Amino acid sequence: MNNVLVLKSSISGNNSQTNQLADYVIEKLQGNHIVVRDLAQQPLPYFDTVAAIAVRGEPKTTEEKQLLALSDELIEELKNAQTLIIGAPMYNLNIPTQLKSYFDFIARPRVTFQYTAKGPEGLLKGKKAIVLCAFGGLYDEENLVTQYMKSILGFIGITDVQFVYAQGIGLGAEAIEKAQSSAKNKINELITSL
C-alpha cells in the first residue's frame, strides 16, 4: 500500500479541471492510504512576518507557536507520503496563492532542505510527484507553473516529478473534453508505476 498526499489548490471547486483530475487519481488509487488537503477550501494563513519568524526561529508568542505547529503538521503529512499528487492550475501565468503558501510553510531550513557548500540540498528524497496542470490556453513546458513546480519540488528533494497537462480548456467544451481525455490517459500511464 502506498501513502499518497493529494493537494488541491483550485478556487473553482467542483468546476475545476485540476480538481476533477485529482478526483480521478483518487478514484484510481483506491486501496492506498490517501490524505487529501484542499488548500482552497481550507486555506492556510498568509505567510507573513509572523509566520516567517515562527518557522525559521524560536517562536515566542502563541500565534508564532500555532504557526510552527501548522508547519510541523504539513511537513509530517508530506514526509509520510511516498507519492504526492498536486493540482496546480494556472492563474495569471502562475500557481494559485494557496499553493504558494503551502510551499512557504513546508520549505524549512534543516527540516526539508539544507544549505551546503555546493548549494541547497533537499531532504525529502525518494518521493514521487505527479503535478496536474490545467491551462486555459496552450503553453509549452517553459511556462511558469511547470518551472516553479520543478524548482520548488527539487529544492526540497523531490526530483521524480511527472506533469499531466489539460491545456486549452478556455477554448470551449470540445477542447475541455479533449484535454480531460488526454490528461486521464496520461494519468493511467503514470499510476501504473506507483
From Swiss-Prot:
What EC number is given for this enzyme? 1.6.5.-, 1.7.1.17
- Gene3D superfamilies the UniProt entry points to: 3.40.50.360
Q: Output the Pfam families linked to this UniProt entry.
A: Flavodoxin_2 (PF02525)
Q: How is the cofactor bound?
A: Binds 1 FMN per subunit.
Assigned keywords, A-Z: Flavoprotein, FMN, NAD, Oxidoreductase
Q: Does the keyword Flavoprotein apply?
A: yes
Chain's role: Quinone reductase that provides resistance to thiol-specific stress caused by electrophilic quinones. Also exhibits azoreductase activity. Catalyzes the reductive cleavage of the azo bond in aromatic azo compounds to the corresponding amines.
| Name of the protein described by the UniProt record | FMN-dependent NADH:quinone oxidoreductase
What organism does the UniProt record list as the source?
Answer: Haemophilus influenzae (strain PittEE)
